[in-house]
């Protein structure tokens, strides 16, 4: 379980984030042959019936952020890597590349089984898939505190709030769309959600006072973590060393998994419609994921309503002789962050209900009268998720020169900056293959992690059509 905390800390360093929608490829919204556009708007139907090749039918992985890996991980001598906390990285160099609020999200949408067919007066869909979304947001001042610390006899940091959240579940969705009038089509999708893991931590109203005598933190912090079979002990229960009232602190090092199982249950609804204004102009709208998830075996922890002392984050060095690898540095940063949060366990084994993050999609498409195989579209997507909310507007050009081939290219403006996307879709008889990206990745690391910002998306699928 220590590794989970370490990877979450690593994600926090790669940016600090907000939510991204676990949905289909936005670039395919206006393509008739794109089989999964019903995941963007339940009123949309593809031009063929289909069933997916298990797991390979629709794979969609993406990250979004206004910073990148290169803001937090730096090269050193000997072809090694180190974090921004290394004294070889200057504060000006590190802080100069950050935003006032640094955000990142990582998302996975995988269709295990999916099918669509005509019947009962309309188009019907069945989806069983994995949905995973993790988000972080961190103010720049927090990283300044980590890197610089005390810069005079008395230093005060007013950090505001920061948070990290992850939600993971299996979704079973049944959809139906039909034409009501010649120019109006409506659709709905009913979803049953089976919970895996939910975790959320938030620190608000944070004030850090640094003096020659002591470093003191005051914040309102809360944490919920829910997963079947997960045991979250206190330091007193695990036998860890502590002093004073520290016995009720969460012992992150000794979190254990006993017997995994169903971690929660939820329901959700998608609603959508399309309306043909005139022969060559169609508008559409959809609201997705109106619903809730009820989690079981939830552990709740919070800070005390009083300040606590903190020794600060280590100024990590990397010498060839000390074996201080990047992995070791992330471990050390994780330990420091756990001490910083100062979360006392209040309850365990409880219930927790949370509304889902909803997504609003609005679209308009105009086909050229003289060549209706070429169309231009605009799609607006807004993720409604509190501090993790985001929005984007995307202009696209789409062409279907052949009955079995279509493609699109688009330009978008998002909460994280501008981006370009594309999709190609081959759908001859029997088979359908699509590949696309909503965010064209720039420079990447050897592990294919975006360096300059976290905006990256890849979607592909192989399906059988009939």
Positions of the model-derived regions?
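Subset of outer-membrane beta-barrel
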Residues: 23-466
